[in-house]
Amino acid sequence: MYPLIKKALFNLDAENAHQLAIQSLKLFGKTPFSLACSLPDNPTEVMGLRFKNPIGLAAGADKNGEAIDGFAKLGFGFIEVGTVTPVAQDGNPRPRQFRILEAEGIINRNGFNNLGVDVLIENVKKAKYNGILGINIGKNATTPIEHSLDDYQICLRKVYPHASYVTVNISSPNTKNLRSLQYGEALDDLLRSLKAEQAQLSQKFGGYKPLVLKIAPDLTAEEIASVADSLVHHQIDAVIAGNTTLSRDSVAGLPFADQQGGLSGKPLNALSTQLISQLSQELNGKLPIIGSGGIHSVQSGQEKINAGASLLQLYSAMIYQGPDLVRQLVRKISI
């Protein structure tokens, strides 16, 4: 079935195809049908949360939380929506998504296009899904980098009562200077302030919601060690490793490989697994790792678990392989 759907979708511009898929999943979420009902439970506990299985939807697929119920019916053990910013923004000019067909990769320079945090919250409230929901937050492009904390605090305060956990995205390559927040004092200042905000919100709402940091796969070994120290020092609850890459080594010479933006999909797999392995050595079990980036098979997912990940997230591979990949991973990944 999916090969026919894929053929139709791939006749469209990548972003138009994505929007059509979201609208289709939105409709699917309102039907009585589900692809998840025959799946066995493979429960695991991470960050004090119980996941029905370790396979999650990565942020970026459903930026505005429009199709939560539809994605849930594909069999995911958890869903992460966003990245969302304090106010709506258009993102970068189109075209901004490019398929690297030969490598099953995608380059995007979306730039956090979204309808704003308030719209996302309304969509979350409408959803019937009652599983683990992560909300991924970012900064507006017009906010100076020195005022980034303001945007993250605004989003954290608004999404806190509606999320199972909150992910702080400081690793998109498509928002100017955003990745500079991953380093040294800038990272420490951000994490210190957000942990203080988390403590206040925990008291206000009578419940603790884990705080997760999403990092880039392009960090050096020294930078990974520094990030790990900051994560432990500030008692961050988990880390997502990782975001898209600026490297083109795995797709050099292929059509559209020279397009600006972050590369995801199969070509990212080895780099993200290496990041997980290095992080795992540095963290030594002090906080969990959520493996994301390039998962395209049971083997590639299991390699990330074996490298130190406790949970997995995917998105790009579904574009090439369809939703059956989710069910394969749920059935066969061993924690």
Swiss-Prot record:
<feature type="binding site">
    <location>
        <begin position="243"/>
        <end position="244"/>
    </location>
    <ligand>
        <name>substrate</name>
    </ligand>
</feature>
<feature type="binding site">
    <location>
        <position position="63"/>
    </location>
    <ligand>
        <name>substrate</name>
    </ligand>
</feature>
<feature type="binding site">
    <location>
        <position position="136"/>
    </location>
    <ligand>
        <name>FMN</name>
    </ligand>
</feature>
<comment type="pathway">
    <text>Pyrimidine metabolism; UMP biosynthesis via de novo pathway; orotate from (S)-dihydroorotate (quinone route): step 1/1.</text>
</comment>
<feature type="binding site">
    <location>
        <position position="294"/>
    </location>
    <ligand>
        <name>FMN</name>
    </ligand>
</feature>
<feature type="binding site">
    <location>
        <position position="242"/>
    </location>
    <ligand>
        <name>FMN</name>
    </ligand>
</feature>
<feature type="binding site">
    <location>
        <begin position="59"/>
        <end position="63"/>
    </location>
    <ligand>
        <name>FMN</name>
    </ligand>
</feature>
<feature type="binding site">
    <location>
        <begin position="315"/>
        <end position="316"/>
    </location>
    <ligand>
        <name>FMN</name>
    </ligand>
</feature>
<feature type="binding site">
    <location>
        <position position="174"/>
    </location>
    <ligand>
        <name>substrate</name>
    </ligand>
</feature>
<dbReference type="GO" id="GO:0044205">
    <property type="term" value="P:'de novo' UMP biosynthetic process"/>
</dbReference>
<comment type="similarity">
    <text>Belongs to the dihydroorotate dehydrogenase family. Type 2 subfamily.</text>
</comment>
<dbReference type="InterPro" id="IPR005719">
    <property type="entry name" value="Dihydroorotate_DH_2"/>
</dbReference>
<dbReference type="InterPro" id="IPR001295">
    <property type="entry name" value="Dihydroorotate_DH_CS"/>
</dbReference>
<comment type="subunit">
    <text>Monomer.</text>
</comment>
<keyword id="KW-0560">Oxidoreductase</keyword>
<dbReference type="InterPro" id="IPR012135">
    <property type="entry name" value="Dihydroorotate_DH_1_2"/>
</dbReference>
<dbReference type="InterPro" id="IPR050074">
    <property type="entry name" value="DHO_dehydrogenase"/>
</dbReference>
<dbReference type="GO" id="GO:0005737">
    <property type="term" value="C:cytoplasm"/>
</dbReference>
<feature type="active site" description="Nucleophile">
    <location>
        <position position="172"/>
    </location>
</feature>
<feature type="binding site">
    <location>
        <position position="83"/>
    </location>
    <ligand>
        <name>FMN</name>
    </ligand>
</feature>
<keyword id="KW-0285">Flavoprotein</keyword>
<dbReference type="GO" id="GO:0106430">
    <property type="term" value="F:dihydroorotate dehydrogenase (quinone) activity"/>
</dbReference>
<comment type="function">
    <text>Catalyzes the conversion of dihydroorotate to orotate with quinone as electron acceptor.</text>
</comment>
<feature type="binding site">
    <location>
        <position position="214"/>
    </location>
    <ligand>
        <name>FMN</name>
    </ligand>
</feature>
<keyword id="KW-1003">Cell membrane</keyword>
<feature type="binding site">
    <location>
        <position position="169"/>
    </location>
    <ligand>
        <name>FMN</name>
    </ligand>
</feature>
<keyword id="KW-0665">Pyrimidine biosynthesis</keyword>
<protein>
    <recommendedName>
        <fullName>Dihydroorotate dehydrogenase (quinone)</fullName>
        <ecNumber>1.3.5.2</ecNumber>
    </recommendedName>
</protein>
<dbReference type="InterPro" id="IPR005720">
    <property type="entry name" value="Dihydroorotate_DH_cat"/>
</dbReference>
<dbReference type="GO" id="GO:0006207">
    <property type="term" value="P:'de novo' pyrimidine nucleobase biosynthetic process"/>
</dbReference>
<dbReference type="InterPro" id="IPR013785">
    <property type="entry name" value="Aldolase_TIM"/>
</dbReference>
<feature type="binding site">
    <location>
        <position position="265"/>
    </location>
    <ligand>
        <name>FMN</name>
    </ligand>
</feature>
<dbReference type="GO" id="GO:0005886">
    <property type="term" value="C:plasma membrane"/>
</dbReference>
<feature type="binding site">
    <location>
        <position position="169"/>
    </location>
    <ligand>
        <name>substrate</name>
    </ligand>
</feature>
<dbReference type="Pfam" id="PF01180">
    <property type="entry name" value="DHO_dh"/>
</dbReference>
<feature type="binding site">
    <location>
        <begin position="108"/>
        <end position="112"/>
    </location>
    <ligand>
        <name>substrate</name>
    </ligand>
</feature>
<keyword id="KW-0472">Membrane</keyword>
<keyword id="KW-0288">FMN</keyword>
